Amino acid sequence: MTASNLSSRLRIGQLANRSAGLRPDLLAVASLIQPGEKVLDLGCGEGDLLRYLQDNRQVVGRGIELLESSVLACVRLGISVRQGNLQEGLRDYPAGSFDSVILSQTIPYLNDPSFIIKEMLRVGSRAIVTIPNWGHWRCRLSLLLTGRIPQAPGLPQAWDAAPRARPLTIRDFEEFCDRQGFASAGAIYLQGKRTIPDRFDKDLRATTAVFILKP
C-alpha cells in the first residue's frame, strides 16, 4: 500500500467517525477536498455532501439539482443551489470557477457523459466522479444464476425504472476515460464502506469507485 493510499484510508475513517449519515462514496469524496476549496456538486440531491463540506471543510459550495423537492431541501439547509439540468447549469460558469467539480453516482443516467465531464474539467481544476460498479462479483453471479439484469451495489433500481441507468463497470469507465483523453489523477475503490487496494481484481471486488480526473 502506498503512503497516499494509507493517508486516504485514514482520512476516510476520520470522516466516517464524524458523519455516519453520508454514503461511503461521499465520505471518500470529502476526504479529497481541502479546506476553503470552491466546490460544485452536480446532481447534489438534498445537499448532504455540500452541507458536510461547508461545516467541516469550510468550502465555498454550490450545487445543481433537477428535482424541485431536493432544491427546496438544499435551500432549507442554506446551500446555494440552482435548479436545472447539468448541461444548462454548467454552461453558465466561466472556465476555472471551481477547484473541484463533483459528480456522484450520476454517470449511468447521462445521455452524453463525455460532454459533461469535459464541462466539469472546463469549469474546475479537477473532476471527482463516483460510479456504481456492475462488474462486482455479486452482480456477475446474479446475472449467471437468474438471467436477469442485476442491480448495482448501492443503486437498488430495476432496469425499467425511470430514469433508466446504463450499467457500467470500473473497466468500462477507465477505458472510456482513455478514449476521451481524460487524465487520471488517482482513484479510490470501495467495497461497501471499506477501501480496497488498486489490484487486478478491483473490478470484481469493488462496489463503488471514486475517480479523480484532470484536464
Regions found by a protein language model. Give the residues of each.
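Glycine-rich SAM-binding Motif I of class I
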Residues: 47, 51
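A short SAM/SAH-binding and catalytic strip from SAM-dependent methyltransferases
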Residues: 100-111
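Class I SAM-dependent methyltransferase Rossmann-like catalytic core
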Residues: 7-21
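Class I SAM-dependent methyltransferase "Motif I" SAM/SAH-binding loop
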Residues: 43-45
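Class I SAM-dependent methyltransferase SAM/SAH-binding core
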Residues: 52-89
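Conserved alpha-helix/loop element of class I SAM-dependent methyltransferases that forms part
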Residues: 20-36
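Short conserved loop adjoining the S-adenosyl-L-methionine
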Residues: 89-95
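S-adenosyl-L-methionine-dependent methyltransferase catalytic module, highlighting the catalytic core
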Residues: 114-119, 126-215
